[in-house]
Swiss-Prot record:
This is Deltorphin-like peptide. Expressed by the skin glands. It comes from Phyllomedusa burmeisteri. The keyword Secreted applies. One of its GO terms (cellular component) is extracellular region. One of its GO terms (molecular function) is opioid peptide activity.
Length: 7
């Protein structure tokens, strides 16, 4: 989920 939020 972190990756998605960072994108």
């Amino acid at each position: 989920y972190m990756f998605h939020l960072m994108n």
